[in-house]
């Protein structure tokens, strides 16, 4: 039974799931909008919002914490110096999920996930 299970497994092993979320997070930070399946988008929202909250502090410890999660210098710098300052006055709700279509091959619900631009 699933009672209060804290996250979606997405049909993957633990390491595969963490790699997937890391790669999706890098993609959304670089392009600010991506299309993926709805369950992945919902799981990614939680992951990215925690990163942005950490990055908002802007100090070297925040930089290290974000880099530990993303393992990508370019993306970490963009998140800490460009993306996070936009959300300085916003308490959460940094992303938006918009349902788009049903994928033809497997009827998976697709959605855009994007960073909210004020």
UniProtKB/Swiss-Prot annotation:
InterPro entries: Ribosomal_bL17, Ribosomal_bL17_CS, Ribosomal_bL17_sf. GO terms for cellular component: cytosolic large ribosomal subunit. GO terms for molecular function: structural constituent of ribosome. The keyword Ribonucleoprotein applies. Keywords: Ribonucleoprotein, Ribosomal protein. SUPFAM superfamilies: Prokaryotic ribosomal protein L17. PROSITE patterns: RIBOSOMAL_L17. It holds the Pfam family Ribosomal_L17. GO terms for biological process: translation. Gene3D superfamilies: Ribosomal protein L17. Part of the 50S ribosomal subunit. Contacts protein L32. Belongs to the bacterial ribosomal protein bL17 family. This is Large ribosomal subunit protein bL17. It comes from Campylobacter concisus (strain 13826). The gene is rplQ.
